[in-house]
Amino acid sequence: MRTSQYLLATQKETPADAEVISHQLMLRAGMIRKLASGLYTWLPSGLRVLNKVANIVREEMNKAGAIEVLMPVVQPADLWEESGRWEEYGPELLRVKDRHQRDFVLGPTHEEVITALVRNEISSYKQLPLNLYQVQTKFRDEVRPRFGIMRGREFTMKDAYSFHLEDSCLEETYQKMYDAYCAIFSRMGLDFRAVIADSGSIGGNHSHEFHVLAESGEDAIAFSSDSDYAANVEMAAAVAPEKAVPSGADVETKDAKGKDFNAILKSVDANATNAVKVVLVKGANELNDKGEDVVCDKWVALVLRADHELNDIKAEKIDGVAIPLVEASFEQAKDVLGVSPFFADATNLPVPAYVDASAAALADFTTGAGAGGKVNVNVNWPDGINTVDIRNVVAGDASPDGQGTLDIKRGIEVGHIFQLGRKYSEAMNCGVLSETGKHQTLTMGCYGIGVSRIVAAAIEQNHDKFGIKWPDPIAPFKIALIPMNMHKSHRIKEAAEALYEELVALGIEVLFDDRKERPGVMFNDMELIGIPHSIVIGERNLDNQQVEYKNRRTGEKQLLDLSAAKEFVAAL
């Protein structure tokens, strides 16, 4: 491809509204242009990358036995009513009416459509298992689209859905999809982790997320130093330390002051690692004699080590805790506890209490004394406390699998797989005749990859101050051909044209910069776009029948004989 015949569309300045580096570089490198909030046009360079990502996804899905289909973006509302999600789904679901005032949605996911399809097309166990996928545009009406295509309203996604008679068969396909996802991200040259995850609103039991590691990632990933264990911090089990042995020292009450809990601890020379804090949360509703949900004014106390953070997902799994988790305000906590929560005695609370295992392992710890401005030190737990895991793990914690310690890095979620079970198939009566001739509801799996999100995530992981540093498999072009002052030198033009034709004949993707531009502009643009390899043709090197090769990722430079350049590039 010649730049003179291409929409290069690079920009020198960083757009003011672009917050993250991937958004900035995608705009500056001429990959995308904003049409409206959360909506982007893909320009040629961006589309080339997007298509390469999608092709790798397709190849690995096909290899794993999945079959490609294409479903409508617009979906009838009656399918969503049938599944129960018409009422459950939030304002992210864009609802529209046609000219006949019939309700439709712009699909954010396709569980309903695929379940209806299989319900109508599959009637016998002999047609199973079946795994169908598509690569298609989705729409979610994000309340605050941001970070460019990272969190846009319209995006490209690969979503696959598998159908099975037995859970054991689902587990086999789930493992195939897990392996396929690992192959996909490995082929793209990305540093990623597959982590144990929460199934969220989609539903189901078993779930893994796939994260591209990047400092700008929204999610915290915990993984073992010595094994393959990895989990979202929200899901990682916290291994409690061995229980400390009390010294036998008497409990001592001290005066304390401070605007926050850390200041209070500091005022009595207490360490947060050997102190506990009380978090008051709303209790769950109760059922009346008719089985109806009755809102009750109950509260539950959660006790953690003072330096640890409460994990909402873990806390919501405690019987008696309201879902979603609702923390009491400072004034509410003060009214319920009879004292500021900073000075509440964690060993003697007026409401049901659950103690995190790491806090329960403490001895001679510091807690409130149950009176304003007072704390107790050298406190130990009474018998019979309720011990739970309700904290986020931290770096240095023991790995839950017993191998090594945990490290924590930021990650960008680019894939998610679920064992859905029968959530949708039961709601939509999707089943087949089993071998015994009885109707059997199918069990399902769901497997998503954010195709367009991968493009942004790859940039977040692969860039420098000059621009993007694409991994070879997803780069828009393999090599940039940069002839310096070609329009002033016949022999440079001749050498460049000849090499370009040779490389194209080999099927190599080349961006031939044949613009009438200064060499500095050409170099800057090629580095900004992030093409992995470049060949520079200049007068001085051409005197020796040589050209210069540069590797964008490593910065390596070397001189090549012009006659050997074609073979060198082909071997990259």
Swiss-Prot record:
Entry GO CC: cytosol
Keyword DNA damage in annotation: no
Location of the protein in the cell: Cytoplasm
UniProt GO BP: prolyl-tRNA aminoacylation
InterPro entries (alphabetical): aa-tRNA-synt_IIb, aa-tRNA-synth_II, aa-tRNA-synth_II/BPL/LPL, Anticodon-bd, Anticodon-bd_dom_sf, Pro-tRNA-ligase_IIa, Pro-tRNA-synth_IIa_bac-type, Pro-tRNA-Synthase_IIa_type1
Its EC number(s): 6.1.1.15
Main location: cytoplasm
Gene Ontology molecular function, alphabetical: aminoacyl-tRNA deacylase activity; ATP binding; proline-tRNA ligase activity
Alphabetical keyword list: Aminoacyl-tRNA synthetase, ATP-binding, Cytoplasm, Ligase, Nucleotide-binding, Protein biosynthesis
A Pfam entry, by short name: HGTP_anticodon
Catalytic activity: tRNA(Pro) + L-proline + ATP = L-prolyl-tRNA(Pro) + AMP + diphosphate
Keyword check for Nucleotide-binding: yes
Function: Catalyzes the attachment of proline to tRNA(Pro) in a two-step reaction: proline is first activated by ATP to form Pro-AMP and then transferred to the acceptor end of tRNA(Pro). As ProRS can inadvertently accommodate and process non-cognate amino acids such as alanine and cysteine, to avoid such errors it has two additional distinct editing activities against alanine. One activity is designated as 'pretransfer' editing and involves the tRNA(Pro)-independent hydrolysis of activated Ala-AMP.
Family: Belongs to the class-II aminoacyl-tRNA synthetase family. ProS type 1 subfamily.
PANTHER family to which the protein is assigned, alphabetical: MITOCHONDRIAL RIBOSOME PROTEIN L39/PROLYL-TRNA LIGASE FAMILY MEMBER, PROLINE--TRNA LIGASE
Domain notes: Consists of three domains: the N-terminal catalytic domain, the editing domain and the C-terminal anticodon-binding domain.
HAMAP family in UniProt: Pro_tRNA_synth_type1 (MF_01569)
Subunit: Homodimer.
Protein name per its UniProtKB record: Proline--tRNA ligase
UniProt source species: Alteromonas mediterranea (strain DSM 17117 / CIP 110805 / LMG 28347 / Deep ecotype)
UniProt lineage: Bacteria, Pseudomonadati, Pseudomonadota, Gammaproteobacteria, Alteromonadales
